[in-house]
Swiss-Prot record:
It comes from Saccharomyces cerevisiae (strain ATCC 204508 / S288c) (Baker's yeast). One of its GO terms (biological process) is cytoplasmic translation. Component of the large ribosomal subunit (LSU). Mature yeast ribosomes consist of a small (40S) and a large (60S) subunit. The 40S small subunit contains 1 molecule of ribosomal RNA (18S rRNA) and 33 different proteins (encoded by 57 genes). The large 60S subunit contains 3 rRNA molecules (25S, 5.8S and 5S rRNA) and 46 different proteins (encoded by 81 genes). The lineage of its organism: Eukaryota, Fungi, Dikarya, Ascomycota, Saccharomycotina. The gene is RPL2A. This is Large ribosomal subunit protein uL2A. The modification Phosphoserine is found at residues 52, 95, 159-160, 249.
């Protein structure tokens, strides 16, 4: 009988849980309220900070609480061009400036936005990584829908009430610089999770992995595996719709 393979061990957590001790906190938009739905609310960028394990910087933005006499600090993903002391306006009637938060229905076609909500009020789900952005393709006022192009190139239709931040997420070009050394990769993943270094299955013994063993390193069978396979067999291309080289012109789904 074989051993418990790596992906089975990951499911149990333990040493594979993410390293969150040095994180600044969850980066989200403001909770959707009356001020944002019908007008705007003003905040100020107090600080731009590094977040461990994240490629993009974070901005700590302070808003007045609309219901109580106090200040509320929100953590936004910083956009390129945002600076400390800058006023951030959030709401339907906010101006079209970098860093401001607006519903997609109030943003003209061709505008670049980031940290876009998938559903109104979820506080940001799309285009959140460094250098990422979403492009507004068009609006359908009759159905209150907006069509956008995601960083992957796929197109998606979402509600025009979903909010986004004007501009591109800061930290673009991060992946263009090669790591070059194993030591740099070590420090990178030390703050993320236990996912490095990753031993190949064909380099293992047959007891450790479905691809292990043999007089030379080869998988020895088709690497596609069914969705209904038991967890100890799930290694390789799991439930792949297709495999191999993409030939000809690629079409993005409309």
């Amino acid at each position: 009988m074989g051993r418990v393979i790596r992906n089975q061990r990951k499911g149990a957590g333990s040493i594979f849980t993410s390293h969150t001790r040095l994180r600044q906190g969850a980066a989200k938009l403001r909770t959707l309220d009356y001020a944002e739905r019908h007008g705007y609310i003003r905040g100020i960028v107090k600080q731009i900070v590094h977040d461990s394990g994240r490629g993009a910087p974070l901005a700590k933005v302070v808003f007045r609480d609309p219901y109580k006499y106090r200040l509320r600090e929100e953590i936004f993903i910083a956009n390129e061009g945002v600076h400390t002391g800058q006023f951030i306006y959030a709401g339907k009637k906010a101006s079209l400036n970098v860093g401001n938060v607006l519903p997609l229905g109030s943003v003209p076609e061709g505008t670049i936005v980031s940290n876009v909500e998938e559903k109104p009020g979820d506080r940001g789900a799309l285009a959140r990584a460094s250098g990422n952005y979403v492009i507004i393709i068009g609006h359908n006022p009759d159905e209150n829908k907006t069509r956008v192009r995601l960083p992957s190139g796929a197109k998606k239709v979402i509600s025009s009430d979903a909010r986004g931040v004007i501009g591109v997420i800061a930290g673009g070009g991060r992946v263009d610089k090669p790591l070059l050394k194993a030591g740099r990769a070590f420090h990178k993943y030390r703050l993320k999770r236990n996912s490095w270094p990753k031993t190949r299955g064909v380099a293992m013994n047959p007891v450790d992995h479905p691809h292990g063993g043999g007089n030379h390193q080869h998988i020895g069978k088709a690497s596609t595996i069914s969705r209904g396979a038991v967890s100890g067999q799930k290694a390789g291309l799991i439930a792949a719709r297709r495999t191999g080289l993409l030939r000809g012109s690629q079409k993005t789904q409309d």
